[in-house]
UniProtKB/Swiss-Prot annotation:
InterPro entries associated with the record: RraA, RraA/RraA-like, RraA/RraA-like_sf, RraA_gpbac
Protein's UniProt keywords contain Cytoplasm: yes
Keyword Cytoplasm among record annotations: yes
The name this protein goes by in its record: Regulator of ribonuclease activity A
Key words of the record: Cytoplasm
Subunit structure: Homotrimer. Binds to both RNA-binding sites in the C-terminal region of Rne and to RhlB.
Any one Gene Ontology cellular component term annotated for this protein: cytosol
A single GO BP: negative regulation of RNA catabolic process
């Protein structure tokens, strides 16, 4: 499904929070939406493998990487795993790498920046926790909608049809 965050903001202005415009699109899908699962990990993506191995249909993995752009939390292998398990998208408050490969994949990926250095894989981090970045507080179960214009968050799913 294609989302227009500008139109959604016009309709649901009182019901949504707008994420500050810090992010760029790196995935092959420019528009995506779904229920978020939060994860907090700093320069370590080991936990992401476990989460992305689960069925992600209708879900977005929202990753709080502390805003670090020193190491990429998402690479082509992780993104392919997400596509294989039907995730709608990945939002990374941090960096990604292998961007030429990422843009070929049918998944939405929003991140702060790209860098060639990979993350550690020790599995340090926690999931289903409250995270805050971009002027918004995110909880697992919230609904996020993204396109090239920006990202918006709602506690409940928006009536898009």
């Amino acid at each position: 499904m294609k989302y227009d965050t500008s139109e959604l903001c016009d309709i649901y202005q009182e019901d949504v929070n707008v994420v500050e415009p810090l992010f760029s699109n790196f995935g092959g899908r420019s528009s995506f939406g779904g229920q978020i699962i939060t994860v907090k990990c700093f320069e370590d993506n080991g936990l992401l493998y476990d989460l992305l191995e689960q069925n992600g249909r209708g879900h977005i993995l929202l990753i709080d990487g502390g805003g670090s752009v020193r190491r990429a939390l998402i690479d082509a292998d992780l993104a392919r795993l997400a596509v294989q398990n039907e995730w709608e998208g990945l939002v990374v408050y941090g960096a990604v790498r292998q961007v030429d490969d990422l843009e070929e994949l049918d998944i939405g990926i929003q991140a702060l920046a790209a860098i060639p250095v990979g993350a550690a894989g020790e599995g340090i981090g926690e999931s289903d926790v409250r995270v805050n970045f971009g002027g918004v507080t995110f909880f697992s179960g919230d609904h996020l909608y993204a396109d090239n214009t920006g990202m918006i968050l709602s506690e409940d799913p928006l009536d898009i049809e």
